[in-house]
Amino acid sequence: MFSKILIANRGEIACRIQRSCRRLGIATVAVYSDADARAQHVRGADEGRWIGASPPAESYLRAERILAAALDSGAEAVHPGFGFLSENADFAEAVEQAGLKFIGPSAASMRKMGSKAGAKILMSAAGVPVVPGYTGEDQDPDLLMREAERVGFPLMIKAAHGGGGKGMRVVRSAGEFAASLQSCQREARGAFGRDRVLLERYVERPRHIEFQIFGDSSGAVIHLNERECSAQRRYQKVLEESPSPFVDARLREAMGAAAVLAGRSIDYRNAGTVEFIVGPAGDFYFMEINTRIQVEHPVTEMVTGLDLVELQLRVAAGELLADLVPTQPVPTRGHAIEVRLYAEDPDNQFLPGSGRLEMLRLPTTSASVRLDGGVVEGDQVTVHYDPMIAKLIVHGPDRVAALAELERALAATIVVGPKSNVEFLERLIRHASIVEASIDTGFLDRELGQILITPPPVPEAVLAAVAVRALLDEEANAAILARAQRDPHSPWGRADGWRLGHPGKRLKSFAHREQLLEFAAHAKVLSTEIERVIAAAAVRGTFQ
């Protein structure tokens, strides 16, 4: 096993890797930019190395600086995390050529997956299911009609040199094909100057289901079951879970075998994820292999009990999967769900936020609640990097229990400072499609307007009542303390806001829906008046 590694990343994933290393007795070296000089991943490492200015292009994407830091620190290996250089074959190759271990797949495997079109050709040749289609140069209309019938309907006609949604038509029957082909070719010719088209089976309302795989130096490849990531917004994952509520034992066996076959076909080593698109009838097709650890890996850890980062480290150090994970298929327990807490504004097209985290209250962790974060209260969310605050992962004996645990955990989460998506996530997990698991990759985009409906404001009388309750509790606690003092009648032992020469005044603050609400309680004769300090319209009330 390694004695020291460098983590070529920042934020949440760097902190996550450090936790496994700390438990295994491995020293860690952090790299940091100007903006991250006091970041959590730097404070949590055994040592740190500055690698450049704040923009990623001047720091976390500077492979030569990161490699120099690794060599200078005496690290034996480099863990790339996810994002940045994690899937850069040249970086992986440079690390190995420098005499260090790259904690991930080989550069050769990465290059084979670098082209999505090339990857599909390779997978098809290996026997992994890919979406049927036609990509040939021959554009004779009669040939295209025959190919369409071979591919099957519904299918999609796509401009070969297009993009941006132009030159695309969904065709649901043979009778529609000729007219749709002509229309698509005209649009492609006008938009791109070329009218060549491709044909591809159209999978309606698909699910995104992926399999976690691992390979080792002996050539062994295994899978650790599936995760479902169908709740997406513009192809960005929002909620991930394991096991998939859609996958039964038969489908799991078939997809798992295909995932292992995909890994073996490119001599895969270390952690990877084989992504599939799955139709409503259970037909599944290869999409791509992510050649790194995934953001959503904790849901697999929660249901298998395995530490995937530890597995990465041990496999990179030469240990074999047969010894590390002897039981196949890997047994799972219960249900896990992950959501990502972001500094972003869902009501403003999910615009990323930045600024100081004035207040950050996260749920208490337990066997059923896990938090993977890279910031704490008082830290800055900068404009330079992904605005993730934390990943919230929950576990329950079944999906219903896990959703209930997630609802409780989100209710206990408070973010004051930059806008966050906490309230959006609370509404999302209560949506009928999520509760019933009747989702597909387009669900969230279709239903976004409904989920973004802002709930009615809390009535002013309720806010005033909350303030009254807090004041009464404060007075009751003060009375208990006063009785314990030598002089129970001392004005210093009373919580009535008494001030010499001025009316009594007490301030109370509450966090609600990412707002800091402040109330002032003014002492009157035999009563107290409560005023909302920062409201546009004051909330007023009195109590005797």
List the predicted regions and their residue ranges.
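N-terminal beta-alpha lobe that positions the nucleotide/phosphoryl donor
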Residues: 1-274, 278-297
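Catalytic cores of soluble metabolic enzymes centered on carboxylation/carboxyl-transfer
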Residues: 259, 298-543
